[in-house]
Amino acid sequence: MAIKPPSTNPNAASTPQALTFPAQTFAKLSPSAYLTAHLTSPRGPLRPSGRKPSEARPPTVHTGSLTHTHGSAVVRCGDTAVVCGIRGEILKVEDVADWESICRQRENIPTGSESTTEPHDTTTEEEKKRQRRKQDTAEISNLHLLVPNIDLATGCSPAHLPTGPPSLQAQTLTHRIHTLLHTSHLLNIDDLQIWSLPPPPSSPAPQSGMDEAQEDTEPLEKMAEPEIKAYWTLYIDLLFISLSGSAFDTAWLALLAALHNVRLPNAYHDTDTSSVLCSPLTSDSKNLNLNDIPIPLSFGVFHGEGEGGAKGEGKGGKWILVDMDGFEEGLCKEVGTVVVGEGGRVVRVEKGGGGVVGGKEMGGLVEKARGRREEWVGVLEKG
């Protein structure tokens, strides 16, 4: 029996085998170190998805997919997908609890013709437009004409099972969507009003004198004055198909795309039946005239692990990550959102959880949000 001679390599016994395991296992065992390793790569800071810290995921939009709604859209950003359906319901003024006070407020609002007749009025047209939008938003808010609702209990992620009451995240997202709908002054009240049609003019009867003609004309003039009889209430349902970060941004884009797709029937108040009727012709339907297209950009601050495991020190440092995915959101304590509108105007800023993002960093995020708005506006126009 032959005996195998010992190895002539002196380092064979002393060289330990390297311990290797998949990247997914590394991410689960030490997620912070895993993300730090990517951001401190010699090739430059790259996230596990291959994006740079300031790079957002491109969205895709498909509108008009739901036939039972007045407007719908499906939006996907990375692995996050949202379906938005908008349906209008008629709210009669008889069902408004405080309708008389709302009417008095409307009477106190000067019209455009009245405001221009003031001899010493120095208000510019832009300021008048802003005031009118604020008044429209106040009326929409008082009547509760915009009713958003977000549903995460669709199995979109392991954290949101299709059982139980709405989660805290779903309620928070609904509140943020509702707040931005009003603070951005997105809709005009004129698009939601339903007026009474004036009665057809009757043939004048022969009149014997001027007094009789004047008595017959006055009631006709009063009857011919149009009145607001009802409003459109928009019920906005947002369902998450899948969720992997940037829930607010994706939900808001789906809402904007669905609003662009809305076509409300031509509704009017019929004096004979004292009810609101809708035209069956699709050619008579109308779109919503949006005042602006506010676009959000969410971000988070990641504190990396440096030498010795000290967070925020050494080689790790701090990184501002925009459009975070689900893995990155779990590692960022300081988060926020910047919303910009037409002309780069800052509509809203939300931030909490830390003090890394100061004025300089926020200015850079606003510029990134302006660039993202141009991208999203192009996607909405194509969709």
Regions found by a protein language model. Give the residues of each.
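Polyanion-binding surfaces on beta-sheet-dominated domains and ring/shell assemblies
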Residues: 2-383
